[in-house]
Amino acid sequence: MKKFLLILVLLFAISNAKERLVVLDPASIETLFMLGAGEQIVGIANLQHSNIYPSDKISQLTSVGTFSNPSLEKIISLKPSLVILSSYSLNLEEGLKNFGIKSLYLKADRFDDIKKNIQILAQITHKNEEGKRLISEFEKGLESLKNDPLNRSAIYLYSNNPLMAFNDNSLMAEILTLIGIKNLSPKSQIERPIISAEFILKQNPDLLILGINANQAFLTQNALLNQTKAIKTGQIYTNEKTRILLRLSPKIIERIAEFKQALKSLKDS
């Protein structure tokens, strides 16, 4: 009987064991905190251009370097049970394997990938019920964002030198469609195709949205672009939060809502 009870205790301990996670992917960090599993993170990679939610708790975590250049030595020193990689740190996989450290890369390109990754992280951290709740909240958030569509057309420029837009089958296009904006960027296998001022004029969008490497001064100085409806009516919006808007964690719901409200305010101004 005592042996049986001991086995039960051991099984319970294993099933509720806390992971020691080093997380190099910002979206996974946010998802883990939203699952209530933040205490299982022992190290992260820092970002230089944007914050990671929740910033007050993130600042207390051990850094293993930057997002683009994490340190293998620092990661190993934390004795993680699992390292969650980003697309920028896939080159660490072999080195981690040599030290007997497991790693995982959670690819994410679309909204559906967020739900899949919530489920995976919930299983890893023994937060399955929290995962189901978070997926449900995420789905409801997506549906809510479809309400009161903006009913406009737009081209979202990634940069203006050269002129590069987010293509019509990108995550950004999915975001625009969700809030009722017709994306007039071209269909392309290239995620951010180069386009011409002539193309923009021909499409003549209601709105021009400027992203990470685009600035309004260049557009207003371009004779062709000055003929577009967007510039004539002053419907140009610079989104300084483009990077964080494209981060595929459940926090994207709040970020899209903020983005949508900013575009609505521009229209009403």
Predicted regions and their residues:
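A short, structured surface patch at a secondary-structure boundary
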Residues: R20-L78, L82-Y88, I181-L184
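His/Asp/Glu-enriched short active-site or ligand-binding loop at hydrolase and phosphoryl-transfer sites
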Residues: A45, L171-R192, T238
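Sec-dependent N-terminal signal peptides
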Residues: F4-S15
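Proline-aspartate-enriched helix->loop->beta-strand connector
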Residues: S71-L85, I101, S196-L210
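Basic- and aromatic-lined ligand-binding clefts that recognize polyanionic substrates
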Residues: K18-L35, E129-I181
